């Protein structure tokens, strides 16, 4: 995971932690989950390509991390992160 770079809006990160109980720092770990499931998310932005990652945090919580890629794919911008719901847990490859 050391080659991955992350960025986010600090205000959004604070709001996300309050609302969902998931820090963006914790969400970074989902990107190192070898079983992570990457899903295209074309419906939520016309300006940029967005993606949803289902992946495990270091504390083994299954997270849903909405993100996009910046700087020609060299930077991952985290937009939101939350715990997966029952339907999302059912599609996660274990």
What spans do the regions from the language model cover?
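Ribonuclease/tRNase effector modules and their secretory precursors
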Residues: 1-94
């Amino acid at each position: 995971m050391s080659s991955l770079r992350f960025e986010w809006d600090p205000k959004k990160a604070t709001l996300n932690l309050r609302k969902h109980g998931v820090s963006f720092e914790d969400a970074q770990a989902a990107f190192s989950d070898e079983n992570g499931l990457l899903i295209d998310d074309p419906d939520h932005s016309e300006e940029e390509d967005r993606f949803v990652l289902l992946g495990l945090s270091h504390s083994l919580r299954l997270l849903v991390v909405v993100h996009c890629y910046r700087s020609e794919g060299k930077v991952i911008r985290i937009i939101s992160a939350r715990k997966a719901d029952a339907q999302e847990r059912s599609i996660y490859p274990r």
